[in-house]
Amino acid sequence: MYYTSGNYEAFATPRKPEGVDQKSAYIVGTGLAGLAAAVFLIRDGHMAGERIHLFEELPLAGGSLDGIEKPHLGFVTRGGREMENHFECMWDMYRSIPSLEIPGASYLDEFYWLDKDDPNSSNCRLIHKRGNRVDDDGQYTLGKQSKELIHLIMKTEESLGDQTIEEFFSEDFFKSNFWVYWATMFAFEKWHSAVEMRRYAMRFIHHIDGLPDFTSLKFNKYNQYDSMVKPIIAYLESHDVDIQFDTKVTDIQVEQTAGKKVAKTIHMTVSGEAKAIELTPDDLVFVTNGSITESSTYGSHHEVAKPTKALGGSWNLWENLAAQSDDFGHPKVFYQDLPAESWFVSATATIKHPAIEPYIERLTHRDLHDGKVNTGGIITITDSNWMMSFAIHRQPHFKEQKENETTVWIYGLYSNSEGNYVHKKIEECTGQEITEEWLYHLGVPVDKIKDLASQEYINTVPVYMPYITSYFMPRVKGDRPKVIPDGSVNLAFIGNFAESPSRDTVFTTEYSIRTAMEAVYSFLNGERGIPQGFNSAYDIRELLKAFYYLNDKKAIKDMDLPIPALIEKIGHKKIKDTFIEELLKDANLM
């Protein structure tokens, strides 16, 4: 397995690997990583579909990529997915997945054309004081603190270790709009990993100019399940892949001799009945270890989503594997000590009455029902005790929605603070109470909130997710298992709790697909290179552009930097009529 850039290998078709007809694949989990592994086995590994088996404990595929109308509850999406043009492995896969919407097109074509016709942007990112846009929304307001971000990027991961974001940055950094944008967009909290924040800063530095208004982002036409999962399922079914639901893998016995690790037996329950599959070294096993949406509980408009700390299948499986080898990671690092303040609850509100719409449209300046971009991403309420954010994507978000309905995704970044209006913690609230808090912050008159939050006007389903921010917990090398653990012959880890050699960023669709691609190509010795992530952090043009936008579009001479006038004058003379001057001018720094 190796990496490549450019389009020479991107458009090449790898030849059939030697011995692939004697191999079989067993994939644990039908989240995006598991589905992608099956796609790459077929497309690039030339493995017959009937030799590929996927095991899913739930009755539905997709993992965290959800979107469903739950009987007796209503429409539910537990989270959203933000994409960008440099998700190299993701677009590499979806170019081969036929669109279910446009005959003869790929899903990449469908997505690309949608974004061309209706590019994403936000007209309002931050509000406060009951529905009023923050005056300096659109500015990072970092000032001198921009140098702290540069300092983070200059550090090595080894030197940061398990340091938290709060331990690295000053208090003034957290007062900036940059931190509000960053924390609420990516779900970072102060006690999360400084290493992961550094990875994010380096990975997405080319989008610094487009984060405040979300022009850097791209979204699906519908919810994640309909748009992203269904086309892959259709592709796999067309290749006769075996997908088994209500099947929970509980353990995998691994034989370790002479420095080699060979998966020998898969233990599982199928519809509650214990079964086992004996394996040979030619049987390839791909494990999705851990899950941010494992053990989710659902409330209703009148019921709370009950808090839980149940580990569930994916975490228990990882624990059983980790007990066999230190090379299989340390799951407790991620799930055991999540602070009470962490994000745990999201909610999906379905607006059924036009009385609420004006309070939204005065922020977006867009028609909710024209089928185009609405909020363009989340709108964050900066004076919300919950640090509440909400998003309204293109409507309908579900094909089953009625013509006048609008679905809204809501979440609170802080779970142990009382609301400004409801005076309860978000995890103690019913769907109606979460709606009341949201309407209060939108500026709905207090005497109308109770009525407009009633089920006659809106239906809101809260979800409690005990491990939703576990990706970002402080960690050190070895806490996440390598995609191919040292000495492994036939066992791979895939998904966002596996350690990709690429140092890409977790909590992204790209990372799920990348780890799957790395695992398949490693086992089958694929002769085609895996696309590198866009290394914008090593492009001086992108760095200069980011420096300009982090300082709110100021030229160097106007920045609050400790540069004496004499040195500045000498510096200008030295670079005059040089390539450096050209670069600085292109970045608007001179």
Curated annotation (Swiss-Prot):
Listed name of the protein: Oleate hydratase
Binding positions for FAD per the UniProt entry: 33, 56, 64, 82, 249, 291, 508, 512
Family listed: Belongs to the oleate hydratase family.
Pfam families: MCRA
Names of required cofactors: FAD
Note: Unsaturated fatty acids are toxic for many bacteria due to deteriorating effect on bacterial cellular membrane and disruption of bacterial fatty acid synthesis. The hydration of unsaturated fatty acids is suggested to be a detoxification mechanism and a survival strategy for living in fatty acid-rich environments.
Cofactor: binding details: Binds 1 FAD per subunit. FAD does not seem to be involved in catalysis but rather in the structural stabilization of the enzyme.
E.C. number: 4.2.1.53
Subunit architecture: Monomer and homodimer. Both forms seem to be active.
Lineage: Bacteria, Bacillati, Bacillota, Bacilli, Lactobacillales
Pathway(s) per entry: Lipid metabolism; fatty acid metabolism
Consequences of knocking out this gene: In strain lacking this gene, consumption of the free fatty acids from the medium is reduced to about 50% of that of the wild-type. The mutant strain also appears to be 2-fold more sensitive to oleic acid than wild-type, whereas no changes in sensitivity to linoleic acid is observed. The mutant shows increased survival in blood with reduced adherence and internalization to human keratinocytes.
Organism: Streptococcus pyogenes serotype M49 (strain NZ131)
Regions that span the bilayer: none
Residue numbers annotated as active site: 82, 200
